Protein backbone atom coordinates (compact mmCIF):
# COMPACT_ATOMS: atom_id res chain seq x y z
CA UNK A 1 0.00 0.00 0.00
CA UNK A 2 1.07 3.57 -0.56
CA UNK A 3 1.74 5.06 2.89
CA UNK A 4 0.93 8.61 1.75
CA UNK A 5 -2.59 7.60 0.66
CA UNK A 6 -5.59 6.60 2.72
CA UNK A 7 -7.40 3.31 2.15
CA UNK A 8 -9.85 4.72 -0.39
CA UNK A 9 -7.12 6.50 -2.36
CA UNK A 10 -5.09 3.27 -2.42
CA UNK A 11 -8.07 1.51 -4.00
CA UNK A 12 -8.92 4.22 -6.56
CA UNK A 13 -5.52 5.40 -7.78
CA UNK A 14 -4.77 2.45 -10.05
CA UNK A 15 -8.27 2.43 -11.47
CA UNK A 16 -8.06 6.08 -12.47
CA UNK A 17 -4.48 5.90 -13.76
CA UNK A 18 -4.46 2.54 -15.55
CA UNK A 19 -8.11 1.83 -16.32
CA UNK A 20 -8.96 5.52 -16.93
CA UNK A 21 -12.04 5.37 -14.71
CA UNK A 22 -13.45 8.65 -13.46
CA UNK A 23 -13.23 9.39 -9.75
CA UNK A 24 -16.88 8.58 -8.99
CA UNK A 25 -16.80 5.21 -10.75
CA UNK A 26 -13.46 4.30 -9.15
CA UNK A 27 -14.81 5.22 -5.72
CA UNK A 28 -17.97 3.14 -6.21
CA UNK A 29 -15.95 0.08 -7.25
CA UNK A 30 -13.42 0.59 -4.46
CA UNK A 31 -16.17 0.81 -1.84
CA UNK A 32 -17.82 -2.37 -3.16
CA UNK A 33 -14.52 -4.24 -2.89
CA UNK A 34 -13.64 -2.78 0.50
CA UNK A 35 -17.06 -3.96 1.68
CA UNK A 36 -16.32 -7.47 0.35
CA UNK A 37 -13.17 -7.67 2.48
CA UNK A 38 -14.68 -6.02 5.56
CA UNK A 39 -12.68 -2.79 5.32
CA UNK A 40 -15.24 -0.21 4.13
CA UNK A 41 -15.32 1.59 7.48
CA UNK A 42 -11.57 2.31 7.24
CA UNK A 43 -11.64 4.40 4.05
CA UNK A 44 -9.99 7.42 5.68
CA UNK A 45 -7.28 5.45 7.52
CA UNK A 46 -3.66 5.53 6.43
CA UNK A 47 -1.76 2.22 6.20
CA UNK A 48 0.22 3.05 9.35
CA UNK A 49 -3.05 2.98 11.31
CA UNK A 50 -3.94 -0.55 10.19
CA UNK A 51 -2.92 -3.99 11.43
CA UNK A 52 -1.09 -6.36 9.11
CA UNK A 53 -4.26 -8.31 8.41
CA UNK A 54 -6.18 -5.13 7.66
CA UNK A 55 -3.45 -3.97 5.27
CA UNK A 56 -3.58 -7.32 3.51
CA UNK A 57 -7.36 -7.06 3.10
CA UNK A 58 -7.06 -3.52 1.70
CA UNK A 59 -4.44 -4.80 -0.75
CA UNK A 60 -6.88 -7.52 -1.82
CA UNK A 61 -9.63 -4.90 -2.34
CA UNK A 62 -7.21 -2.76 -4.34
CA UNK A 63 -6.34 -5.71 -6.57
CA UNK A 64 -10.02 -6.64 -7.02
CA UNK A 65 -10.79 -3.06 -8.03
CA UNK A 66 -8.62 -3.58 -11.11
CA UNK A 67 -10.99 -6.33 -12.39
CA UNK A 68 -8.35 -9.06 -12.66
CA UNK A 69 -8.93 -12.33 -14.48
CA UNK A 70 -6.59 -14.03 -12.01
CA UNK A 71 -5.47 -12.93 -8.55
CA UNK A 72 -2.01 -14.02 -7.40
CA UNK A 73 -1.16 -14.49 -3.72
CA UNK A 74 2.41 -15.21 -2.63
CA UNK A 75 2.39 -16.36 1.00
CA UNK A 76 -0.31 -13.82 1.95
CA UNK A 77 -0.24 -14.75 5.64
CA UNK A 78 3.48 -15.38 6.20
CA UNK A 79 4.27 -11.95 7.66
CA UNK A 80 1.13 -11.68 9.77
CA UNK A 81 0.67 -12.00 13.50
CA UNK A 82 -0.87 -15.46 14.05
CA UNK A 83 -4.03 -13.83 15.39
CA UNK A 84 -4.51 -11.96 12.08
CA UNK A 85 -4.10 -14.97 9.77
CA UNK A 86 -7.72 -16.08 10.13
CA UNK A 87 -9.22 -12.82 8.89
CA UNK A 88 -7.15 -12.91 5.70
CA UNK A 89 -7.86 -16.60 5.05
CA UNK A 90 -11.59 -15.98 5.61
CA UNK A 91 -11.48 -13.16 3.05
CA UNK A 92 -9.69 -15.38 0.54
CA UNK A 93 -12.10 -18.25 1.17
CA UNK A 94 -15.04 -15.92 0.48
CA UNK A 95 -13.38 -14.85 -2.78
CA UNK A 96 -12.86 -18.49 -3.77
CA UNK A 97 -16.59 -19.07 -3.40
CA UNK A 98 -17.30 -16.27 -5.91
CA UNK A 99 -15.51 -18.24 -8.63
CA UNK A 100 -12.55 -15.87 -8.88
CA UNK A 101 -9.48 -17.65 -10.20
CA UNK A 102 -6.67 -17.43 -7.68
CA UNK A 103 -3.13 -18.78 -7.73
CA UNK A 104 -1.97 -19.08 -4.13
CA UNK A 105 1.49 -19.95 -2.85
CA UNK A 106 0.92 -21.03 0.75
CA UNK A 107 1.98 -23.23 3.61
CA UNK A 108 -1.57 -23.03 5.03
CA UNK A 109 -2.38 -26.63 4.14
CA UNK A 110 -5.85 -26.84 5.70
CA UNK A 111 -6.85 -23.71 3.82
CA UNK A 112 -5.40 -25.06 0.56
CA UNK A 113 -7.26 -28.33 1.04
CA UNK A 114 -10.56 -26.53 1.68
CA UNK A 115 -10.54 -24.02 -1.20
CA UNK A 116 -8.45 -25.53 -4.00
CA UNK A 117 -9.68 -27.06 -7.21
CA UNK A 118 -6.09 -27.93 -8.13
CA UNK A 119 -3.04 -28.31 -5.90
CA UNK A 120 0.59 -28.32 -6.96
CA UNK A 121 3.08 -29.55 -4.39
CA UNK A 122 6.58 -28.21 -5.02
CA UNK A 123 9.82 -29.45 -3.53
CA UNK A 124 13.03 -27.45 -4.00
CA UNK A 125 11.42 -25.38 -6.75
CA UNK A 126 10.27 -28.38 -8.79
CA UNK A 127 6.74 -29.74 -9.16
CA UNK A 128 6.71 -32.98 -7.20
CA UNK A 129 3.02 -33.76 -7.53
CA UNK A 130 -0.18 -32.17 -8.76
CA UNK A 131 -3.85 -33.04 -8.72
CA UNK A 132 -7.15 -32.24 -7.08
CA UNK A 133 -7.18 -31.36 -3.40
CA UNK A 134 -8.36 -34.91 -2.69
CA UNK A 135 -5.57 -36.40 -4.84
CA UNK A 136 -2.91 -34.52 -2.93
CA UNK A 137 -4.29 -34.45 0.60
CA UNK A 138 -6.09 -37.81 0.79
CA UNK A 139 -4.26 -39.94 -1.78
CA UNK A 140 -0.76 -38.49 -2.30
CA UNK A 141 1.40 -40.64 -4.56
CA UNK A 142 4.87 -39.24 -3.92
CA UNK A 143 6.80 -40.09 -0.76
CA UNK A 144 7.95 -36.47 -0.35
CA UNK A 145 4.35 -35.22 -0.50
CA UNK A 146 3.25 -37.80 2.07
CA UNK A 147 6.15 -36.90 4.38
CA UNK A 148 5.48 -33.16 4.17
CA UNK A 149 1.74 -33.48 4.74
CA UNK A 150 2.19 -35.86 7.65
CA UNK A 151 4.66 -33.49 9.30
CA UNK A 152 2.56 -30.37 8.70
CA UNK A 153 -0.94 -31.72 9.30
CA UNK A 154 -0.09 -33.70 12.44
CA UNK A 155 1.67 -30.64 13.90
CA UNK A 156 -1.62 -28.69 13.88
Write out the residue ranges for each language-model feature.
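Catalytic Walker B motif of ABC-type/P-loop ATPase nucleotide-binding domains
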Residues: 71-74
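A short, proline-enriched helix->beta-strand linker immediately N-terminal to the Walker B motif
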Residues: 65-69
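Conserved ABC ATPase signature
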Residues: 46-50, 54
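Conserved ABC ATPase "signature" region
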Residues: 12, 23-42
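C-terminal boundary and immediately downstream tail of ABC-type ATPase nucleotide-binding domains
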Residues: 134-156
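ABC ATPase "signature
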Residues: 130-131
Amino acid sequence: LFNNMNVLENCTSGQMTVLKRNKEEAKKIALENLEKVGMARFIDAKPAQLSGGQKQRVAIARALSMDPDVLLFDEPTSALDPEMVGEVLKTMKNLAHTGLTMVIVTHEMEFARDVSDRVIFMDKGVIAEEGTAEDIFVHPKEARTKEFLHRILTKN
